[in-house]
């Protein structure tokens, strides 16, 4: 199995992220991105053996299908085809139907499409990617790995909304959670770092990127998470508002805002972008803070405070506590944001290891703080969702 490769596909509404992953080591032998699908400047780029290549994707439509078709030729040209044993697809929403990775057939694809109402930006695109890959690689078994699956272990007290029960029974409204593949991976890596069995370790995993979520993981299982029915709830994010009084929506509608305008604002013009009035990028926020920008400073303060609040509240969900895991683009790389979050958790007794915090960036894992009070640590673990997708696909062969 030393050369057991999996083609991992993450199909977005106007993009296609792909990688050929060694399912044993997690190494990305080939990685690339197709973007601007549906536009005149649709293109596809990839990296192989340190060299980058980019090509234009011609044609007015079917860009997902064209890009995956080009993948067939590319993997053959690079001599990878003979070692690819499966195709793994990242699918955002599995609802209650899919609680684990499944082998894809027509019935599974149709069910993913039926869940489009729960993830209108993601599931239809995922299904397009599946259908294109099934046609392009008909001899390869294909698997769907769901962002929501890891959270299906949440108890009812955690996933049930305090709303009329028929809203759950008739419409499936409940907490589902996302970033599950990331939370799953980093919790296993954290247990290894502490030399503890995953079944006997409990963490609060903090995935901070343009999208962000916190997950309470008790003995290896998700028991609560900050994202809910959709990825809009929970933490403040790059452009998403996070938790918000739902009465505000009614108020804005009464003020003459359209439903589309309200939800565009909450999804695409809030978070770092909305509070700062400047940018959705955490790096831009930090740069502007250094120059005294008030909006950026406030955005930094709101973000770090809300993350700390969630971490503290999730101690109530755990039977024991081994530590905090920071991951995602911001969590893995932003020393000032991690430092401020831990500062806001001063009553938990975390003392920063300044050198450890400096070193744990740019792909490096490490312990960044310790709490003698809780006998716990804060650590950084770079996530690798593609590796999980590859592993779980191979396990079902």
Curated annotation (Swiss-Prot):
NCBIfam families: ackA (TIGR00016), PRK12440.1 (NF009099). Substrate binds at residue 90. ATP binds at residues 17, 207-211, 281-283, 329-333. It is found in: Cytoplasm. Mg(2+) binds at residues 10, 385. PANTHER family: ACETATE KINASE. Keywords: ATP-binding, Cytoplasm, Kinase, Magnesium, Metal-binding, Nucleotide-binding, Transferase. Mg(2+). Can also accept Mn(2+). It holds the Pfam family Acetate_kinase. One of its GO terms (biological process) is acetate metabolic process. InterPro entries: Ac/propionate_kinase, Aliphatic_acid_kin_short-chain, Aliphatic_acid_kinase_CS, ATPase_NBD. It comes from the Bacteria. Its EC number is 2.7.2.1. GO terms for cellular component: cytosol. Belongs to the acetokinase family. The keyword DNA damage does not apply. The record marks 179, 240 as: Transition state stabilizer. Its cofactor is Mg(2+); Mn(2+). It is an enzyme of class 2 (transferase). The active site is at residue 147. It catalyses: acetate + ATP = acetyl phosphate + ADP. SUPFAM superfamilies: Actin-like ATPase domain. Pathway: Metabolic intermediate biosynthesis; acetyl-CoA biosynthesis; acetyl-CoA from acetate: step 1/2. Catalyzes the formation of acetyl phosphate from acetate and ATP. Can also catalyze the reverse reaction. HAMAP family: Acetate_kinase (MF_00020). This is Acetate kinase 2.
């Amino acid at each position: 199995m030393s050369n057991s490769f999996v083609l991992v596909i993450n199909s977005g509404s106007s993009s296609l992220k792909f990688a050929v992953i060694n399912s044993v080591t997690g190494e990305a032998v080939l990685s690339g991105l197709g973007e601007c699908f549906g536009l005149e400047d649709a293109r596809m780029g990839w990296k192989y053996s340190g060299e980058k290549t980019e090509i234009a994707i011609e044609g007015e439509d079917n860009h997902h299908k064209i890009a995956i078709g080009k993948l067939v030729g590319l993997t053959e040209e690079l001599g990878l085809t003979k070692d690819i044993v499966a195709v793994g697809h990242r699918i955002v929403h599995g609802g209650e139907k899919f609680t684990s990775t499944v082998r894809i057939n027509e019935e599974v694809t149709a069910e993913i499409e039926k869940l489009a109402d729960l993830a209108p930006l993601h599931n239809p695109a995922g299904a397009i990617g599946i259908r294109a890959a099934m046609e392009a690689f008909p001899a390869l078994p294909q698997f769907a790995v769901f962002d929501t699956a890891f959270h299906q272990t949440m108890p009812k007290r955690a996933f049930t909304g305090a709303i009329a029960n028929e809203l759950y029974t008739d419409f499936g409204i409940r907490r589902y959670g996302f970033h599950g593949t990331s939370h799953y991976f980093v919790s296993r890596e954290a247990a290894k770092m502490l030399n503890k069995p995953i079944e006997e370790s409990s963490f609060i995993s903090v995935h901070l990127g343009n999208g962000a979520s916190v997950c309470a993981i008790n003995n290896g299982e998700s028991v609560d998470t900050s994202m809910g029915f959709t990825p809009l709830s929970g933490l403040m994010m790059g452009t998403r508002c996070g938790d918000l009084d739902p009465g505000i929506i009614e108020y804005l509608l009464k003020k003459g805002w359209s439903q589309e305008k309200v939800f565009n604002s909450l999804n695409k013009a809030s978070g770092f972008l909305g509070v700062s009035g400047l940018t959705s990028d955490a790096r831009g926020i930090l740069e502007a803070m250094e120059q005294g920008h008030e909006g950026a400073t406030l955005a930094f303060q709101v973000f770090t405070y809300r993350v700390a609040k969630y971490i503290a509240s999730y101690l109530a969900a755990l039977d024991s506590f081994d530590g905090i895991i920071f991951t995602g683009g911001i969590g893995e790389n932003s020393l000032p944001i991690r430092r401020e979050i831990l500062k806001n958790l001063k009553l938990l007794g975390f003392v920063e290891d300044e050198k450890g915090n400096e070193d744990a960036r740019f792909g490096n894992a490490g312990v960044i703080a310790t709490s003698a009070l809780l006998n716990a640590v804060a650590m950084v673990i770079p996530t690798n969702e593609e590796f999980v997708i590859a592993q779980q696909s191979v396990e079902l062969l």
